[in-house]
Amino acid sequence: MQGRLSAWLVKHGLVHRSLGFDYQGIETLQIKSEDWHSIAVISYVYGYNYLRSQCAYDVAPGGLLASVYHLTRIQYGVDQPEEVCIKVFAARRNPRIPSVFWIWKSADFQERESYDMLGISYDNHPRLKRILMPESWIGWPLRKDYIAPNFYEIQDAH
């Protein structure tokens, strides 16, 4: 079984992998990092013009990092939204994923938070810098292999 977007991508020869459906019937697709920008543009044109959320997580210690996008398409009315979840995986050593800021402006702070917490660089993001941690912070706090410092110097907390 395929969702509408997945079927459309297959029909047009665009490489992706379906990871199945969740309990609400929302399909999850895996997209390669190098294909993400073009598929994001296609998704927007296809009608997925609302980015509900973007988040990221560490798949496993020493393993891949994932950036997750929840897209919504409202074609027949607000009571019948069509949703899709897209996962883009990146290597831990140099995690780079194309930014979708220029497609969905709401990705701005969400991609910055993923960068700040996990170190995923979003190519062509206009303001990719730390948003939660101080600029001087070393490391990526939400990575499973992150070693927390023995002390925290809170200078700017006033």
UniProtKB/Swiss-Prot annotation:
Protein name, UniProt field: NAD(P)H-quinone oxidoreductase subunit J, chloroplastic
Gene name of this polypeptide: ndhJ
GO cellular component, one term: chloroplast thylakoid membrane
Organism: Platanus occidentalis (Sycamore)
Presence of the UniProt keyword Plastid in the record: yes
EC category: translocase
Reactions this protein catalyses: a plastoquinone + NADH + (n+1) H(+)(in) = a plastoquinol + NAD(+) + n H(+)(out); a plastoquinone + NADPH + (n+1) H(+)(in) = a plastoquinol + NADP(+) + n H(+)(out)
Alphabetical UniProt keywords: Chloroplast, Membrane, NAD, NADP, Plastid, Plastoquinone, Quinone, Thylakoid, Translocase, Transport
GO MF entries: NADH dehydrogenase (ubiquinone) activity; quinone binding
Functional summary from the UniProt entry: NDH shuttles electrons from NAD(P)H:plastoquinone, via FMN and iron-sulfur (Fe-S) centers, to quinones in the photosynthetic chain and possibly in a chloroplast respiratory chain. The immediate electron acceptor for the enzyme in this species is believed to be plastoquinone. Couples the redox reaction to proton translocation, and thus conserves the redox energy in a proton gradient.
Subunit structure of this chain's protein: NDH is composed of at least 16 different subunits, 5 of which are encoded in the nucleus.
Subcellular location: Plastid, Chloroplast thylakoid membrane
Chief place of localization: plastid
Protein topology in the membrane: Peripheral membrane protein
Record-stated family: Belongs to the complex I 30 kDa subunit family.
UniProt keyword Transport present: yes
GO BP, sorted A to Z: photosynthesis, light reaction
Pfam family, one: Complex1_30kDa
